[in-house]
């Protein structure tokens, strides 16, 4: 209950500033009606910074990577309190929920040092490049290919519905890298960090 009270008190204090800054409409669950506007993006980055500075971004991330190491119960409490207060999220949903955990699990130490702090702080915003014209969200049928070329990969294919793409600094890209016919489809893909 100490965590709930801490978060509740912080939200009570900071939601008033948020309402003054964005207006009543934005206080009811988001930055306002035009979420793609420059004004809405500035507001979202401002709010993300407040959450980050208070230690409420990436709360489930391990402490060694800048998170709180929150328990499942603390994550539930966080979500409940954010919803009760009609508090908007920050800019980092795909970075915090997808790119960051993947980098923690499979990335090099250099990648962890380079990307994780910037994901948490909101300095780098991430999008996903998964869906394709002929596959939609059926990821096993994606056709984009990545072929190794020295130290790099040459990517060839199409992506659609790039969630967050117009405001992103980085993308998580799913591309086929294994072409042997006997390999199951879901094992033919690699996960790329693309700028």
Predicted regions and their residues:
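Short beta-turn/strand-loop junction motif enriched in small, turn-promoting residues
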Residues: 64-66, 87, 131-135, 151, ...
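Conserved protein kinase catalytic domain
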Residues: 79, 100-103, 116, 172, ...
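FAD-binding core of FAD-dependent oxidoreductases
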Residues: 90-100, 123-129, 158-171, 190
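Short, well-ordered, mixed-charge alpha-helical segments that flank or form enzyme active sites
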Residues: 99, 111-113, 134-139, 162-164, ...
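A gly/ser-rich beta-alpha-beta helix-loop segment of oxidoreductase catalytic cores
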Residues: 107, 125-147
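Glycine-rich, mobile lid/loop segments that gate access to catalytic sites or pores
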Residues: 110-111, 147-154
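A short core secondary-structure module
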Residues: 143, 152, 156-195
């Amino acid at each position: 209950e100490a965590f709930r009270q801490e978060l509740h008190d912080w939200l009570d204090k900071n939601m008033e500033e948020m309402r003054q800054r964005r207006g009543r409409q934005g206080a009811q669950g988001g930055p306002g009606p035009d979420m793609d506007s420059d004004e809405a993006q500035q507001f979202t980055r401002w709010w993300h910074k407040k959450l980050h500075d208070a230690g409420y971004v990436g709360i489930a991330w391990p402490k060694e990577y800048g998170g709180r190491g929150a328990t499942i119960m603390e994550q539930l409490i966080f979500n409940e309190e954010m919803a009760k207060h009609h508090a908007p999220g920050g800019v980092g949903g795909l970075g915090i929920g997808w790119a960051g955990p993947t980098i923690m699990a499979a990335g090099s130490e250099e990648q962890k040092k380079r990307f994780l702090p910037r994901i948490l702080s909101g300095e780098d915003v991430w999008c996903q490049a998964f869906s394709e014209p002929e596959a939609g969200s059926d990821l096993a049928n994606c056709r984009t290919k990545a072929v190794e070329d020295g130290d790099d990969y040459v990517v060839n294919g199409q992506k659609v519905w790039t969630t967050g793409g117009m405001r992103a600094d980085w993308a998580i890209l799913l591309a086929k890298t294994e072409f042997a016919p006997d390999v199951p489809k879901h094992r033919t893909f690699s996960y790329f960090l693309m700028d």
